[in-house]
Structure formats: structure tokens, C-alpha cells
Amino acid sequence: MASASPVATMSGRGARNLLQFLRLVGQLKRVPRTGWVYRNVQKPESVSDHMYRMAVMALVTKDEHLNKDRCVRLALVHDMAECIVGDIAPADNVPREEKHRREEEAMKQLTQLLPEDLQKELYELWEEYETQSSAEAKFVKQLDQCEMILQASEYEDLENKPGRLQDFYDSTAGKFSHPEIVQLVSELEAERNANIAGAASEPCS
């Protein structure tokens, strides 16, 4: 019987760098999603919360034409730079080119802490998402928007204020094309519209 391949080990410096990388990525658990902060949502989700559910959404896709593993990886990496630059929202009025420049620098800084093969893998995943250069990147971009309006709906439910976060829905109008996501969004909007209509029909106290 052939013996198992030995597990690769790292140098002390490599371990220290990996620990620093993990601590930086851990900051994502403490970076709130800026859009919710600006709308005075109580206890807003973190960037990490958002990316986790996106990764789960990618994991459960039924589209066999997509590389599911790559979709999950893209979801986990796409906002990783925000552990350094923060969540730059449209309301911040930072030009797209400047936002990209900051995030590109952050990704280079972050991935330099990893072995060369992982540096390349993570940076290229981020770049693929940024440039929307694959079917998987386009799908994950739509997951990003879908997860956002799902979260908006949940905040409206938690606050018992149906329709309060309509601007998040407006910002995604016409942006969904993948059949699976279109169906999911349609169901979400039907439920939300029913909640709004129900609230409107309730007598004022």
C-alpha cells in the first residue's frame, strides 16, 4: 500500500504571515455594510455576513453550466479588500476608478502575505469578479445584488416597516438575468409586496 503524501509545512515566517492574513480577513466580521448604516438599520450585518450567505447561495445553485466551486470562491473573495479599505458605498460618491484602485492596492497588500500560488489564485479571483470576465463572475455579481435585497426585506420585517428600504430594490431594477435568480427575486418581491399591501390596509391606531 502506498503511503500518503506528507502534509506540506510552512516556515515560521510563513505561519506568521498567514496569521496576519487571517487577522486582516477577520476584520470583515467587524466592518458593517455601509448602506445599512446610512439608512439607520439597527445592528447592521457585516461584510463577512454578506459574503457568507452569497457563498451559500452559490453552493446551492442548480445551474450545471456553471463551475459551482469557482462561484463559491468568487463569493468569498469578491469583497475581501474591504477588510483594509472598508465598505465603499455609492452614497460615498467615490469614483468607480478610485474605488477600484484602492481595492486593487488592498488585494495586493493582503495576498502578499500568502504563498505565491495562493497570491495568484486569490488576486485572480478578485480580478475576475471586478472585470466580470466569466459566466461565474456575472452570476456571482447577480447573487451580490440578490442577497442585498433579501437582506433589505429581512430588515423591513424585523423593523415591521414594510417598504422602508425601497431604494435598495430600485437600485437593482433590470440587473437580474440569470433564470434561477430571476425566479428567486420574483418570489421575494411577491412576498414583500403582499406585506406592503397588508400594512397599507391595516387601520391606523
Swiss-Prot record:
- N-acetylalanine found at: 2
Reaction(s) catalysed (UniProt annotation): a 2'-deoxyribonucleoside 5'-phosphate + H2O = a 2'-deoxyribonucleoside + phosphate
Q: What is its EC number?
A: 3.1.3.89
Record: residues binding a divalent metal cation 2: 82, 87-88
HD domain residues are: 47-149
**Any one GO molecular function term:** 5'-deoxynucleotidase activity
Carrying Phosphoserine, the residues are: 3, 5, 205
Q: Answer yes or no on keyword Kinase.
A: no
UniProt KW Magnesium keyword: yes
Cofactor detail note: Binds 2 divalent metal cations. Shows activity with Mn(2+), Co(2+) and Mg(2+) but shows no activity with Zn(2+).
- Which InterPro entries does the entry mention? HD/PDEase_dom (IPR003607), HD_domain (IPR006674), YfbR/HDDC2 (IPR039356)
Q: Tell me its cofactors.
A: Mn(2+); Co(2+); Mg(2+)
**Which family is it part of?**
Belongs to the HDDC2 family.
Its quaternary structure?
Homodimer.
Q: What does this protein do?
A: Catalyzes the dephosphorylation of the nucleoside 5'-monophosphates deoxyadenosine monophosphate (dAMP), deoxycytidine monophosphate (dCMP), deoxyguanosine monophosphate (dGMP) and deoxythymidine monophosphate (dTMP).
Identification of the protein by name = 5'-deoxynucleotidase HDDC2
In which organism is this protein found? Bos taurus
